[in-house]
Design a protein with these regions (language model features):
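N-terminal signal peptide c-region/cleavage motif recognized by signal peptidases
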Residues: 15-17
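Beta-propeller domains
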Residues: 72-91
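N-terminal secretory signal peptides
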Residues: 21-74
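Bacterial N-terminal signal peptides that target proteins for export
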Residues: 1-7
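Acidic, small-residue rich beta-repeat scaffolds with periodic aromatic anchors
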Residues: 21-35, 39, 111-163
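Short coil/turn segments at the loop-to-beta-strand junctions that recur within blades
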Residues: 97-102, 151-154
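Structural signature of eukaryotic scaffold interfaces centered on beta-propeller domains
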Residues: 56-62, 107-114
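Short, surface-exposed coil-to-beta transition loops
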Residues: 76-81, 102-106, 129-132
Length: 163
């Protein structure tokens, strides 16, 4: 009887950990402290958004150690963005637009200077559930790997990700 209870408790703990949202502290990045490089406008998309990129490149790093994550509107309740490498000036595009996030969300993208985790609230490329929360790892100029997704949950459930 006791061994069954212990087993059930262990299974509950393991299940809870598997469902837990990723946390910023689990994706550390070392902040860049050097002089910022000028932004490189090497492709057509970068040249199209040159004004927004140049303006953002003068801001302090705010994401993944050495990047400035810049966003701007692309329609009603829609944003797009890019990460500018302060060390090299290279531009890495966020590979989707974000829209339709819940009204209680004040910022559809959450990020930290000392973390590679990008938390995205809303629909990606105008597809899917607007209440979804997507978690991506930024790895050397690429938002490339979705590491977790939660749907149809209240925003209070995501406080753990903000630590």
């Amino acid at each position: 009887m006791n061994s069954t209870r212990i087993l059930l408790v262990l299974l509950a703990v393991v299940s809870q950990q598997a469902l837990a949202a990723p946390r910023f502290v689990d994706f550390p990045a070392t902040p860049y402290r050097g002089k910022p490089a000028g932004v490189h406008l090497r492709d057509a998309k970068s040249r199209e958004y040159a004004s927004a990129l140049r303006t953002a490149s003068h801001q302090p790093t705010n994401f993944a150690g050495r990047y400035v994550l810049a966003t701007w509107g692309c329609g009603a309740s829609c944003i797009m963005g890019a990460a500018i490498d302060a060390k090299t000036g290279a531009v890495a595009w966020v590979p989707f637009t974000v829209c339709c996030w819940n009204l209680e969300i004040t910022a559809p993208l959450e990020y930290r200077r000392e973390s590679r985790l990008l938390v995205v609230h809303g629909s990606l490329d105008e597809q899917g559930d607007g209440s979804a929360v997507h978690y991506y790892e930024f790895d050397n100029a690429n938002v490339h790997r979705r590491i977790h997704e939660l749907s149809n949950r209240s925003t209070s459930a995501f406080e753990a990700a903000r630590t």
